[in-house]
Amino acid sequence: MAEDPHILGLALGGGAFRGTAHLGVLKALEEEGLRPGFLCGTSAGAMAAAFYAFGMAPEEIRNVARNLRWLKATNFTFSKLGLLSNNEIGKFIEKYLGEVQIEDSSIPLAIVAADISTGEKVVFKTGSLATAIMASTCIPGVFMPTQVDGRMLVDGAIVENVPIKVLQEMGAKVCVGVDLGSGGYRQPESLVEVLLNAFSIAIDRTIHHQGEKADVIIKPSLAGYSLTDS
């Protein structure tokens, strides 16, 4: 795999603020001389995949992630479609990567979201990176859906949390998935944490069949992590 990176694909699953665990996986692969030829991600995994695909090293991404204030009170909205605006994510992406297009990444990249009106999987391989990440990380109920071309898009975890099938469609011959759904849960202390726990529990109950498509599934130890830890 090290000699021909174009056969290796890496799918990074969602997990709210557990997403920083993906960086340890990326670093471990680098230490083994492995660099993916294809990247795709859902939710927090989409963010990690995007920064890596645009050339950031894992430790650099970790330092950048510390500056994200995703659940800021100033993002509160009175919309009937969600408690918070997800605009902060779009601004965050553009601050560190600029107003880039997905197709300009140094590693072929795909971002997974879902159409909340139809239940369809929506895969971004071109277009605004910031918009795609906003859609993919838009946890239903917590954030307002992201409007893209007349569609209401939300967190891709509801359709494919570890998007192995997308990797296969991109051309990867060896597909590795990273599942962040094994970390347990903490007692919630706010409405947002109740919603995050409920969403994650529902996704975790459906993830096992997605992993069957992978050649390898990595499940980092996440005991003690909260969905709102950074």
Give names to the regions the model predicted:
Residues 1-42, 50-230:
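Patatin-like phospholipase
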